[in-house]
Amino acid sequence: MSEEELTNGPGPEPQPEPLEVESAPLEAAPAGEPDKALLEAQQQASENWDRFVRAQAEMENLRRRLEKDIQNAHKYALEKFAKELLPVMDSLELGIAASTGDAPDVAKLREGAELTLKQFKSVFEKFGIAVVDPLGEKFNPEQHQAMAMEPAGEAEPNTVVKVFQKGYLLNDRLLRPALVVVAQA
């Protein structure tokens, strides 16, 4: 090796010659014929978007329905309990109506029952339970159950002339219909 090769290193490395690549011109699609793959991709994208929008709408509807169900569950949670208390309320009212007499013991019993009834009504009102006492009102089949019909007499036809049993509503939902007698035309 020569001194020059040692100091400068080996001679310049041979550079590869640039290759000439013959490029074929890209064939353009004839005018008026869209690319089939592009059309398929657009169609798939459209279908996916449609599915996405439908899924979003379905989720929104489900969310609304669940919110409504939860609200109703809170609102009407007392329904079974209230239905069980209605006969107790009826019995208390009948007991008060039957407690006639001037004896001091009867008067005390009546007074206690009236106070209890007042407390019952207060609690019912507090929890959204309303009484349906339709005497003299127009017959409403959504809130009243006709037990009999009587000749109208002085009452207008199709009005309630007698109430056998009061009805009750829980937050405007019927707990029990009022049992009534309706004036006949």
From Swiss-Prot:
Belongs to the GrpE family. It is found in: Cytoplasm. Homodimer. Residues 1-44 are annotated as: Disordered. Coiled coil: none annotated. InterPro entries: GrpE (IPR000740), GrpE_coiled_coil (IPR013805), GrpE_head (IPR009012). The keyword Cytoplasm applies. GO terms for cellular component: cytosol. Pfam families: GrpE. One of its GO terms (molecular function) is unfolded protein binding. This is Protein GrpE.
